[in-house]
């Protein structure tokens, strides 16, 4: 059963899917150290070009997510946090001119702090399928009008891991895309449109091997409306984010990925407006 904690709205019953859809305000420039993170990598002298040949087969990732939300009222500042991690297996196969994919989640764990409602038990495994082509990722599930927060989170992971990549790039190369993702906030279906800008920073030495560093900058607009108990709720959000991709230089596969995002959320219910600031970060690490 969902509950109200005073004026604290149940925004983060799970990690907000559309807040994790994109890659927060940390400066993405190479060479700047971020607090609490390892020093920024040093670019090699190579300027490319690098050519990619997409690889079929199976790879696995451990994905950790952290989100915090803050509401400032006249009387107090209220903060909550939630963390989760998943182990996801991603398989790619050639299907004509496109690639088909299957993502399987066999581990999903949630840790909450504060007034956030404990997450429901997740039935495992979770499987999503779809295809990857010139038009980007096409997801066969979840449906846009569904409200399965966990499956929507996994769908967002796929958009992060299977980001578009030109067949050949050089240092300084830039490209853009726009993706639409579907999430679930407190039982309210949400739709987010994310505009992403990719820039090739160059080759770096990472874990004693050369990888290609690609930076991403995002802007997000999200909307949702529906019933929460006896209340009509409207959710709106705008945010900005960054991401750092460490890619295999031969295949373009993701070896490691870090995303950060800061989102301003407004919730209207029963004629009252509530404002929140949400910060999220994700770390994707390939484990096989």
Each language-model region and where it sits:
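Bacterial N-terminal signal peptides that target proteins for export
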Residues: 1-9
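C-terminal motif of bacterial Sec signal peptides marking the signal peptidase cleavage site
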Residues: 18-19
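Short, conserved catalytic or interaction motifs in soluble domains
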Residues: 22
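Signature of exported/secreted
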Residues: 27-288
């Amino acid at each position: 059963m969902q509950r109200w904690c005073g004026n604290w709205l149940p925004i983060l019953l799970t990690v907000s899917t559309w807040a994790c859809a994109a890659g927060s305000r940390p400066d993405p420039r190479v060479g700047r150290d971020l607090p609490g993170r390892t020093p920024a990598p040093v670019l090699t002298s190579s300027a490319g070009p690098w050519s990619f040949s997409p690889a079929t087969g199976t790879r696995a990732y451990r994905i950790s997510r952290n989100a915090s939300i803050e509401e400032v009222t006249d009387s107090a500042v209220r903060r909550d946090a939630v963390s989760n991690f998943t182990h996801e297996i991603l398989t790619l196969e050639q299907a004509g001119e496109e690639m088909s994919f299957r993502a399987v989640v066999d581990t999903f764990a949630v840790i909450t702090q504060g007034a956030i409602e404990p997450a429901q038990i997740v039935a495992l495994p979770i499987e999503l399928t779809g295809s990857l082509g010139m038009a980007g990722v096409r997801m066969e599930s979840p449906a846009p009008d569904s409200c399965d927060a966990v499956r929507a989170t996994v769908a967002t992971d796929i958009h992060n891991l299977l980001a578009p990549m030109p067949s050949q790039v050089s240092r300084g190369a830039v490209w853009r895309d726009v993706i639409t993702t579907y999430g679930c906030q407190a039982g309210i279906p949400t739709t987010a449109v994310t505009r992403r800008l990719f820039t090739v920073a160059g080759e770096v030495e990472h874990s004693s091997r050369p990888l290609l560093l690609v930076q991403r900058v995002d802007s997000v607009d999200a909307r949702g409306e529906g019933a929460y108990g006896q209340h009509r709720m409207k959710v709106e959000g705008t945010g900005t984010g960054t991401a750092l991709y460490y890619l295999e230089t031969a295949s373009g596969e993701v070896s490691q990925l870090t995303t950060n995002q800061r989102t301003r959320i407004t919730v209207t219910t029963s004629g009252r407006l509530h404002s929140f600031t949400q910060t999220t970060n994700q770390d994707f690490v390939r484990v096989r």
